[in-house]
Amino acid sequence: GLPVCGETCFGGTCNTPGCTCSYPICTRN
């Protein structure tokens, strides 16, 4: 939820392990 993973998820998925989509960016926890 807090740190940004340096990835966007406009497609709805995140490729970075441990990261989830908090549209439109990927976050970790």
Swiss-Prot record:
It comes from the Eukaryota. Pfam families: Cyclotide (PF03784). Disulfide bonds join C5-C19, C9-C21, C14-C26. There is a cross-link at G1-N29 (Cyclopeptide (Gly-Asn)). This is a cyclic peptide. PROSITE patterns: CYCLOTIDE, CYCLOTIDE_MOEBIUS. The keyword Disulfide bond applies. Coiled coil: none annotated. This is Cyclotide vibi-B. It comes from Viola biflora. The lineage of its organism: Eukaryota, Viridiplantae, Streptophyta, Embryophyta, Tracheophyta.
